[in-house]
UniProtKB/Swiss-Prot annotation:
Task of the protein: Catalyzes the radical-mediated cleavage of tyrosine to 2-iminoacetate and 4-cresol.
Descriptive protein name: 2-iminoacetate synthase
Catalytic activity: L-tyrosine + S-adenosyl-L-methionine + NADPH = 2-iminoacetate + 4-methylphenol + 5'-deoxyadenosine + L-methionine + NADP(+)
Organism field: Escherichia coli (strain K12)
Similarity section: Belongs to the radical SAM superfamily. ThiH family.
Quaternary structure and partners: Forms a heterodimer with ThiG.
Cofactor note: Binds 1 [4Fe-4S] cluster per subunit. The cluster is coordinated with 3 cysteines and an exchangeable S-adenosyl-L-methionine.
Any one Gene Ontology cellular component term annotated for this protein: 2-iminoacetate synthase complex
List of residues binding [4Fe-4S] cluster: 85, 89, 92
Xref: Pfam families: BATS, Radical_SAM
Record-annotated Radical SAM core domain positions: 71-301
The gene coding this protein: thiH
Length: 377
C-alpha cells in the first residue's frame, strides 16, 4: 500500500532548495497568470524572486478566497486536555524533560472548560494534548468525546498519531477532523529535535494523514513548524507536495493548512531560519493559489496587527483567545502552557476587527438536525 512516504523518498531536499532559489521573475509572472498551478509554479511563488510580486500575489489570493468562501471567516478555539507528554522535543513546552506542573483534565474539569468556551460563543473545538498514549490515549478519548460531541458543532483533534482503526473508531464517536503537523520534512533535522519517545519515528508521523484518509476522517490538517529547519521555503514546498498527494489519493476528505511559526516556550530553542511577516504572507497566498478550495488557518501565534491585515487576504479559519494550557479558560495558569500566544484579544474583539473590514465571522456552520458525516455514512 503506497503512502506519502513513497513520494517523499523521490524528493531531494537540496535539489528543491536549488530549484526554488533559481526561479526568476519570469517564472513568478507565469505562475501568477496560471489558471492552475504546477509544482514548478508553486516553487516560483515560494521563491525569493516572488518577494517583489507580493501585492499581485495577495490580490489574486484575495479574489480566489472571496470567490470560494465569500466574506466568511470561521472561528475555532483549542481546548487543551492534558500537558502530559512521553516525548522529549527541543521546541515544545510540554516536553517530558521540562520541569513543569502536569495536569490532565477530568470530567468535571472538561465540563467547566466547555461551559467557559461556549459562553464565549465558540462551536468549533480543537482538542489538544501532549503525546502520552498510556494516560491520554484511546481510553481517555472514548470517555470524553461523546459528552463533548453533544455540546459542540465540530470536534477536531491535535494529539499523538494513532492507528487507522483508532481513527475510524473516533470518527464514529463524533470526530470531524485531525490536525497533524510533520514539524519538518527534513529527516536529519527532525531527528535532532525529537530526542525521546514515539515521536522519534519520522515515518509513523509522516504517514499519519494516509491513515486518516483511509479511515474516512472528514478534514485533515497539515503544516510544518516554520523555523525548525534551516529552510522554511523547502519545508513549505514539502507541505504542498503532501497536500497534492493526499488530494489525489483521498479525495473524499477536506484539507486545511496552517502556518505556525516557532514561538517562545519553556526550554525552547531559537528558530534555525527566520520567516518574516512579508514572507509569511507570501507563503499563505501561494497556498491559496495552489489550492483555492482548502481551508487556510492562522492562529494566535501571530500578532493582532498582523492577523487583522492578513486574514482578509486569504485566511478562512482563525482561533481567538487561545489558552495553550489545560484548564486555561476556567482557571488560567500560564505556567502550564505549551507556548505563549501573541494575540490575546477576546473573541468578540477579533470578530469586531474583522466585521469592520466587511468580513462575516462564523461561529457555527451546521446544526445537529442535519446529522454528521459519520452518521450519514
Amino acid at each position: 500500500m503506497k503512502t506519502f512516504s513513497d513520494r517523499w523518498r523521490q524528493l531531494d531536499w537540496d535539489d528543491i532548495r536549488l530549484r526554488i532559489n533559481g526561479k526568476t521573475a519570469a517564472d513568478v509572472e507565469r505562475a501568477l497568470n496560471a489558471s492552475q498551478l504546477t509544482r514548478d509554479d508553486m516553487m516560483a511563488l515560494l521563491s525569493p524572486a516572488a518577494s517583489g510580486y507580493l501585492e499581485q500575489l495577495a490580490q489574486r489570493a484575495q479574489r480566489l478566497t472571496r470567490q470560494r468562501f465569500g466574506n466568511t471567516v470561521s472561528f475555532y478555539v483549542p481546548l487543551y486536555l492534558s500537558n502530559l507528554c512521553a516525548n522529549d522535543c527541543t521546541y515544545c513546552g510540554f516536553s517530558m524533560s521540562n520541569r513543569i506542573k502536569r495536569k490532565t483534565l477530568d470530567e468535571a474539569d472538561i465540563a467547566r472548560e466547555s461551559a467557559a468556551i461556549r459562553e464565549m460563543g465558540f462551536e468549533h473545538l480543537l482538542l489538544v494534548t501532549g503525546e502520552h498514549q498510556a494516560k491520554v490515549g484511546m481510553d481517555y478519548f472514548r470517555r470524553h468525546l461523546p459528552a463533548l460531541r453533544e455540546q459542540f458543532s465540530s470536534l477536531q483533534m491535535e494529539v499523538q498519531p494513532l492507528a487507522e482503526t483508532e481513527y475510524a473508531e473516533l470518527k464514529q464517536l463524533g470526530l470531524d477532523g485531525v490536525m497533524v503537523y510533520q514539524e519538518t520534512y527534513h529527516e536529519a533535522t527532525y531527528a535532532r529535535h525529537h530526542l525521546k519517545g514515539k515521536k522519534q519515528d519520522f515515518f509513523w508521523r509522516l504517514e499519519t494523514p494516509d491513515r486518516l484518509g483511509r479511515a474516512g476522517i472528514d478534514k485533515i490538517g497539515l503544516g510544518a513548524l516554520i523555523g525548525l529547519s534551516d529552510n522554511w521555503r523547502v519545508d513549505s514546498y514539502m507541505v504542498a507536495e503532501h497536500l497534492l498527494w493526499l488530494q489525489q489519493h483521498y479525495w473524499q476528505s477536506r484539507y486545511s493548512v496552517s502556518f505556525p511559526r516557532l514561538r517562545p516556550c519553556t526550554g525552547g530553542i531559537e528558530p534555525a531560519s527566520i520567516m518574516d511577516e512579508r514572507q509569511l504572507v507570501q507563503t499563505i497566498c501561494a497556498f491559496r493559489l495552489l489550492a483555492p478550495e482548502i481551508e487556510l488557518s492562522l492562529s494566535t501565534r501571530e500578532s493582532p496587527w498582523f492577523r487583522d491585515r492578513v486574514i482578509p487576504l486569504a485566511i478562512n479559519n482563525v482561533s481567538a483567545f487561545s489558552k495553550t494550557q489545560p484548564g486555561g479558560y476556567a482557571d488560567n495558569h500560564p505556567e502550564l502552557e505549551q507556548f505563549s500566544p501573541h494575540d490575546d484579544r477576546r473573541p468578540e474583539a477579533v470578530a469586531a476587527a474583522l466585521t469592520a473590514q466587511g468580513l462575516q465571522p462564523v461561529w457555527k456552520d451546521w446544526d445537529s438536525y442535519l446529522g454528521r458525516a459519520s452518521q450519514r455514512l
